[in-house]
Amino acid sequence: VTTPATNPNKALWEKGDFTQVAASMRESGEALVRAIGVSPGLKVLDLGCGDGTTALPSAQLGADVLGVDIARNLVEAGNRRAAAAGLKNLRFQEGDASDLSPLENGSFDLVVSIFGAMFAPKPFDVAREMVRVTRRGGRIVMGNWIPGDPTLVAQILKISAAYTPPPPEGFISPVTWGVEANVKERFGAAGVAEGDIRCERDTYTFHFAGTPPQFVDTFRRFYGPTMNAFDAAEKNGKADALRQELEALFTAQNQSTEAGRTKIPATFLRVTVSVR
């Protein structure tokens, strides 16, 4: 897989330590892998895999899994998790979702990207590469946050954007992957018929062993986009306003009935592509 040294996303996802946020995503990751239908012997590519929230449970179900991520620290963390779990059928490597060479054409039964490839630049290249490495008769499954959605992550990104400088000209927002028409256009350009693309809304729940303000602090300290928002907000004296806005959001959306715990469901677009 080509070196991602020039990818502007690399610094963003190597900033902080996304594993600290990913810890709140494990339970839903396992449930999603089961719902997708991962089975023994399946060759799976997990794209934008982080430290293995869906890659590790896929391997535990008996699939042969390769995790690819732009961030070296997350790849290293994933390989440590695989070793600790004794999983010989799971490995992680650095790579760019928009250029998966030298992965061979049609080499995977299933390509999974849950809140991963949506953050890569060049979305048409990303779609083309996912289709290219999937065998005929195989599937691609994406999970993408939805722009303007009232639930957690879309609102974190929306609030954060209000505190950060405007993106460079030509920037394509990651949440454009959460719009069905865009999904169909991008995979259509990669040669997929519209009837082979299915989009449905699904729910991903975050489970955090702490209060909503403590969960906000985890995002502030470890999640690249939120860290950047606070860096920018601190420069113009608005960091406290950003913190208060995020704490209000997390507190309002917390559904946990246990004191000192946080449980927040977030809506996403689940995309299933059949490759023929």
Regions found by a protein language model. Give the residues of each.
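A structural alpha-helix within SAM-dependent methyltransferase catalytic domains
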Residues: V33, L56-A59, N79, F124-V131, ...
